[in-house]
Amino acid sequence: MRVGVLSFQGGVVEHLEHIEKLNGKPVKVRSLEDLQKIDRLIIPGGESTTIGKFLKQSNMLQPLREKIYGGMPVWGTCAGMILLARKIENSEVNYINAIDITVRRNAYGSQVDSFNTKALIEEISLNEMPLVFIRAPYITRIGETVKALCTIDKNIVAAKSNNVLVTSFHPELADNLEFHEYFMKL
C-alpha cells in the first residue's frame, strides 16, 4: 500500500517513519504526479493557509478533492484537519471541504499553550493513547455523517466520516503506531 504524506511542512518525516514501521510504502507528495501514485494520503500539521496556497499554486487542490470524493482515504492532522473541514470559524475560506465539520483554529492557544495528554479512543485502541497538541484546533460542530472519536474537556479532537479521518493532535509525534495502523486499514 502506497501511503502519501503531503510533504510541504509539518511532521512529514515522522509520518513517513510510522508508515514504514507498519510495512506501508511511504511516498512524499509534492506534485500532481506524486498524488497520482498513492492509495491514501496524510495531510500533516503546519500552517493551514500556507499549505492551502501550496495546494492551489501547484494545481493539486481540485485533483486532490476528486480523489477524496472518489473514496481515497485521507487523514488530516492539526492543519490538515483545518484543510479538510467544510467550515473554518471566522473565515470565508475553505479548502478541500471533505468532511462536514466546523473547526476553530488555534483553539488551545499559542505555541506556549501546547500540551501532551492521554485518552482512550475506543475505535482505535483498548489502551490510552498519547496525544500531542501543538497550537491545536478543535471541532466545534459535526454533521450527521460525522462520528466523533475523541473529546478532551468537552471539545471534539478526532472525528471520522467515511474515508476521511481528522485529528487536532499529532499522533506522528508520539511513540505509538496505533493511529497510523487504524488509518492504513480505513
From Swiss-Prot:
In the presence of PdxS, forms a dodecamer of heterodimers. Only shows activity in the heterodimer. One of its GO terms (cellular component) is cytosol. It comes from the Bacteria. This is Pyridoxal 5'-phosphate synthase subunit PdxT. The gene is pdxT. HAMAP family: PdxT (MF_01615). It catalyses: aldehydo-D-ribose 5-phosphate + D-glyceraldehyde 3-phosphate + L-glutamine = pyridoxal 5'-phosphate + L-glutamate + phosphate + 3 H2O + H(+); L-glutamine + H2O = L-glutamate + NH4(+). The active site is at residues 78, 170, 172. L-glutamine binds at residues 46-48, 105, 134-135. Catalyzes the hydrolysis of glutamine to glutamate and ammonia as part of the biosynthesis of pyridoxal 5'-phosphate. The resulting ammonia molecule is channeled to the active site of PdxS. One of its GO terms (biological process) is glutamine catabolic process.
